Regions:
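Short acidic-hydrophobic catalytic motif
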Residues: 1-146, 151-227
Length: 227
């Protein structure tokens, strides 16, 4: 009887902590979202005059400015955060896809760039409702670069054939991406080795930071024009 009481009390305490944890991160997500909106409003204002009004400055909407050698292009990819904050793909220190540009969606967000000139060839997002990812990937030509960011659930569009195409673009993790995982990847058509620019976080209810979703991930660096 007494032991039962202790166990119930423990269960209640654990549940309360779990609820508290989720609400803490709801606040964090809200702050991220507010942060993004504010960054949109002040994107043409000097950074020193423009600090977001919310709790902390977590992941600002602008691209982290990066200088690369002349034969390389800077890029930056951030995955979506849970199903709340959209992903961001920057190329040459410019946002190509993001909340700011209102051109992102659940599923996979993808930008394709002409390798040497740096021209943006196409950008789109794919989920069960939009389809078309296979045709999109088949039109990627040798030397093109590809930048991929997950949002909410990347696995919905990943057929075996599509996973293999990503593997051919340098991905070592595309075959392992599961429902609601976080995945960011930069690769190239004609790449001979594995891309170093890839991160995957598994959706695991025991370690998820956002309830049904794991932590977000970022990857960035200098991508060689020629591969
Ligand atoms: C909430 O999210 C932040 C950032 O992702 C993380 O550092 C923190 O541990 C999370 N808090 C809880 C209670 O899960
Ligand atoms: C990349 O950025 C540099 C510096 O802003 C600019 O001069 C160049 O034209 C850009 N290249 C492309 C392909 O956008």
């Amino acid at each position: 009887m007494r032991l039962g009481g202790v166990v119930s009390a423990l269960a209640i305490v654990i549940t309360l902590f779990a609820i508290w944890g989720i609400s803490v991160n709801k606040t964090y997500l809200w702050a991220l979202k507010e942060n993004e909106k504010y960054e949109v409003q002040c994107k043409d204002i000097p950074r020193s005059d423009c600090s977001p009004p919310v709790l902390f400055k977590a992941h600002p909407g602008c691209c982290p400015h990066k200088i690369c050698p002349a034969d390389q292009y800077p890029f930056f990819i951030r995955s979506g955060v849970a199903n709340i904050v959209g992903p961001k793909i920057c190329f040459n220190n410019t946002i190509i896809m993001g909340e700011v540009k209102n051109n992102i969606g659940w599923g996979l967000n993808i930008v394709v760039v002409q390798g040497e000139t740096g021209e943006i060839l196409k950008s789109s997002y794919f989920n069960t409702h939009s389809g078309g990812l296979l045709e999109f990937l088949k039109s990627v030509q040798t030397g093109n670069k590809i930048f991929v960011a997950s949002y909410e659930d990347p696995a919905v569009v990943l057929t075996d054939e599509i996973r293999e195409i990503f593997a051919g673009l340098g991905s070592t993790m595309s075959r392992s991406v599961k429902r609601r995982d976080t995945w960011v990847f930069a690769g190239a058509a004609g790449i001979v080795k594995e891309s170093p620019f890839e991160k995957l976080v598994a959706n695991d209810e025991k370690s998820n930071v956002y309830g049904d979703w794991p932590e977000m991930r970022e990857v960035g660096g200098c991508f060689p024009r020629k591969i």
